[in-house]
């Protein structure tokens, strides 16, 4: 009985830890605008993967070209 309870708590703890981890592009969703298809612009890269398509560039980024639907290609400032 105690082994079943410990196993349940272990599985619950692992599940809780995994749910807390953001995956892929979800970490930056507060800076994104959804496309009509449901995809988020922050997930798309531009300039050979060196920039991100955003509606507005962050303070530590500079605009470098444009993406579709009036989005800017934002690259980190050097």
From Swiss-Prot:
Provide the transmembrane region boundaries.
none
Chief subcellular location: secreted
**Compartment(s) where it occurs, according to its Swiss-Prot or TrEMBL record:** Secreted
Extract the Pfam families matched here.
Answer: Defensin_beta_2
Q: What does this protein do?
A: Has antimicrobial activity.
Return the similarity comment: Belongs to the beta-defensin family.
Protein name as catalogued: Beta-defensin 105A
Q: Which organism is it from?
A: Macaca fascicularis (Crab-eating macaque)
Question: Gene of origin?
Answer: DEFB105A
